[in-house]
């Protein structure tokens, strides 16, 4: 596989600001965003038969499509079920990401992925922005963005995602930590500072 000019990973728990940060960097600095979550949604269609075979007809809605809410409730209530889903989805997502990188070899890339380390995507990145936020702030954001999500489910998701950054020793990687507990204007300024540091470093490498 050829090498893109610059690849930045953006990771963090649910509602930590991954999409917002990726959008800022894409728009301001000319990066192409690869959104692993969106690729994961496409896998539900592509691997529908295999997923239904694993979890049964109970995950289908009235249109005979996989109901994302039903599937989410199922896998976040049982870690074994989550691993079954990941065993199907992760190899496909990884393959899609590598294909996009090949198709855009002259382009600067953002890889937006909550499970960046779990999927070994850090191996593709020059820098990784790790977003963190207080649980209380994450819960408020989720209550606003997903009105029908209950606090029980939020707690289960946060518990599962608790250690997504620390599953392995991180060496030879440029990690950039950002605490996203404030407003958009503050986050935008933080991103500008971090990106200027990256640009300056790359210029003299």
UniProtKB/Swiss-Prot annotation:
Its localization reads: Cytoplasm
Q: Supply the InterPro entries for this chain.
A: Depp_CoAkinase (IPR001977), P-loop_NTPase (IPR027417)
Alphabetically list the UniProt keywords: ATP-binding, Coenzyme A biosynthesis, Cytoplasm, Kinase, Nucleotide-binding, Transferase
What EC identifiers does the entry list? 2.7.1.24
Where on the tree of life does the source sit, at the highest rank? Answer: Bacteria
Query: What job does this protein perform?
Result: Catalyzes the phosphorylation of the 3'-hydroxyl group of dephosphocoenzyme A to form coenzyme A.
Reactions accelerated catalytically: 3'-dephospho-CoA + ATP = ADP + CoA + H(+)
What is the protein name stated in its UniProt record? Answer: Dephospho-CoA kinase
The organism is Borreliella burgdorferi (strain ATCC 35210 / DSM 4680 / CIP 102532 / B31) (Borrelia burgdorferi)
GO molecular function per UniProt: ATP binding; dephospho-CoA kinase activity
């Amino acid at each position: 596989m050829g090498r893109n000019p610059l690849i930045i990973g953006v990771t963090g728990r649910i509602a930590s600001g991954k999409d917002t940060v990726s959008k800022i960097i894409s728009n301001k600095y000319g990066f192409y965003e690869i959104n692993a979550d969106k690729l994961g949604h496409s896998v539900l269609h592509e691997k529908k038969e295999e997923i239904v075979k694993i979890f049964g007809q109970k995950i289908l809605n009235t249109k005979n499509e996989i109901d994302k809410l039903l599937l989410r409730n199922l896998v976040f209530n049982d870690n074994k079920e989550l691993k079954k889903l990941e065993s199907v989805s992760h190899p496909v997502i990884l393959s899609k990401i590598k294909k996009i990188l090949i198709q855009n070899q002259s382009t600067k890339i953002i890889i937006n992925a909550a499970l960046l380390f779990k999927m070994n995507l850090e191996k593709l990145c020059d820098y990784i922005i790790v977003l963190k936020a207080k649980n209380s702030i994450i819960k408020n954001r989720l209550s606003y963005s997903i009105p029908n999500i209950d606090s029980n489910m939020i707690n289960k998701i946060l518990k599962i995602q608790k250690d997504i950054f620390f599953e392995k020793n991180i060496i030879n990687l440029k990690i950039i930590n950002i605490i996203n507990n404030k407003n958009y204007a503050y986050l935008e300024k933080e991103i500008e500072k971090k990106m200027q540091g990256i640009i300056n470093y790359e210029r003299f490498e």
